[in-house]
């Protein structure tokens, strides 16, 4: 598996979570990008505050690293309530979820990351909690077992997932506010890089921030990670300030090219072009050709390449587009 080794992977790695927490915006007005989502949230939050009600349950979905956890924390801050965070795989038993729910206060936010990985038993407990603010608990065992209902204070469940399609229909239907996060444009990412540099006390000019943004694959988490590595380079090889030239030299040294591709991205594209004459090629053959698991190709490598128009996924297999050929200085055969 390659995820642990890639500087440009969108999933959390190493100290990302600790460092990202210091750079996270706290309020919607500080949040950059996702304009439609931000506009919707402003309306929903203000309406809930005017009615003095808990915000409706919210599902935030999209590729990793785009700010789902950050948005959940912003929602809690804007509503002026507490937030309790957990993740789907951690909630193994119904009692795990019950313990969290019974400790919530009125209006609090319960954030469940990777909510698509909830076990069926835990999910069943969640339904009445979301719909009626009630908790069904079984007391005793065998013939003497009986069910009791506990009333819960009104709360907001914020679920986050990279795979909205993996949620069961009953669970998905209980979220009143679905929000999809999209990849960021270079302008918004550049603003994020500049803000993060200020938090770090790092001198950076607009061209340097833009250069990092262009190679960040539309993902703030990657942008912040690259910024930290560029800072290391600037401090050791230059005077500590990040300019476009310093950013280019640092990112080239890190093997992250102008499109944000690393060695594995280029290896995948060149395999389709050179070994399979541009495609179409099936996923199993492609996985064997580059020595990777098919799941890694599908979940880690492909999404960004498809989104940027370098690969087409067809019923017959993967095809390298004309843009992929141009990236390597080639012309696609007719």
Curated annotation (Swiss-Prot):
Q: Which GO terms describe its cellular component?
A: cytoplasm; Holliday junction resolvase complex
Chain residues that bind Mg(2+): 69
GO MF annotation terms: ATP binding; ATP hydrolysis activity; four-way junction DNA binding; four-way junction helicase activity
Alphabetized InterPro entries for the sequence: AAA+_ATPase, AAA_lid_4, DNA_helicase_Holl-junc_RuvB, P-loop_NTPase, RuvB-like_N, RuvB_C, WH-like_DNA-bd_sf, WH_DNA-bd_sf
Record's keyword annotation contains tRNA processing: no
Q: Show the segment(s) annotated as Head domain (RuvB-H).
A: 258-334
Keywords of the record:
ATP-binding, Cytoplasm, DNA damage, DNA recombination, DNA repair, DNA-binding, Hydrolase, Nucleotide-binding
The Gene Ontology biological process terms listed for this entry are: DNA recombination; DNA repair
Q: Give positions of region: Small ATPAse domain (RuvB-S).
A: 185-255
Q: Does the keyword Nucleotide-binding apply?
A: yes
Large ATPase domain (RuvB-L): annotated segments: 4-184
- Which reaction is this enzyme known to catalyze? ATP + H2O = ADP + phosphate + H(+)
The organism sits in which domain of life? Answer: Bacteria
Kindly list the positions annotated as binding ATP. Answer: 24, 65, 68-70, 131-133, 174, 184, 221
Q: Where does DNA bind?
A: 294, 313, 318
Any Pfam family the entry gives: RuvB_C
Subcellular localization, as worded in the UniProt entry: Cytoplasm
HAMAP family named among the record's database cross-references = DNA_HJ_migration_RuvB
- Describe its function: The RuvA-RuvB-RuvC complex processes Holliday junction (HJ) DNA during genetic recombination and DNA repair, while the RuvA-RuvB complex plays an important role in the rescue of blocked DNA replication forks via replication fork reversal (RFR). RuvA specifically binds to HJ cruciform DNA, conferring on it an open structure. The RuvB hexamer acts as an ATP-dependent pump, pulling dsDNA into and through the RuvAB complex. RuvB forms 2 homohexamers on either side of HJ DNA bound by 1 or 2 RuvA tetramers; 4 subunits per hexamer contact DNA at a time.
> What is said about the domains?
Has 3 domains, the large (RuvB-L) and small ATPase (RuvB-S) domains and the C-terminal head (RuvB-H) domain. The head domain binds DNA, while the ATPase domains jointly bind ATP, ADP or are empty depending on the state of the subunit in the translocation cycle. During a single DNA translocation step the structure of each domain remains the same, but their relative positions change.
Q: Which family does it belong to?
A: Belongs to the RuvB family.
Entry protein name:
Holliday junction branch migration complex subunit RuvB
Task: Write down the species.
Answer: Shewanella oneidensis (strain ATCC 700550 / JCM 31522 / CIP 106686 / LMG 19005 / NCIMB 14063 / MR-1)
Task: Give the source lineage, highest ranks first.
Answer: Bacteria, Pseudomonadati, Pseudomonadota, Gammaproteobacteria, Alteromonadales
